[in-house]
């Protein structure tokens, strides 16, 4: 977290606020979250399963030569395995949605990840984890949202439901995202 304070030097920023699993700050008007714990699930058994998968994914990230790297303007950025990322980014958006509001940008992030890395997703592992962590129906509704409203090709949605047409639940989900606004801070302007 000391590194974040160094990033603030000479920039407009809001003092960083810490909570049990992340540091939240604003840097030049952009919200930044640095997680010390990737996330957690409610329920001891599900959380233990998720923490184990997180550790295995991070070990794979830093302990093998299969490291996925994104070139961010000449700076290499290590990426977690696509299967873990596909789950984690959606789970993170759902946590925000159920607590403080979710930014539509987070759904776009997940959609773009699937568009770029769908071929690298281990569908069998993802299906098993979605079932174990009780996220199958959530995956399907967000998938309908990504395909029906954001233009993700159905072929790029791992474990796509048979019926991808946005239904009542998908429209309710979309309405909730727009009402809750950007992390609960809706601004009509």
Language model features by range: what are they?
Residues 2-189:
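Conserved NTP-donor binding/palm subdomain of two-metal-ion nucleotidyltransferases/polymerases, i.e.
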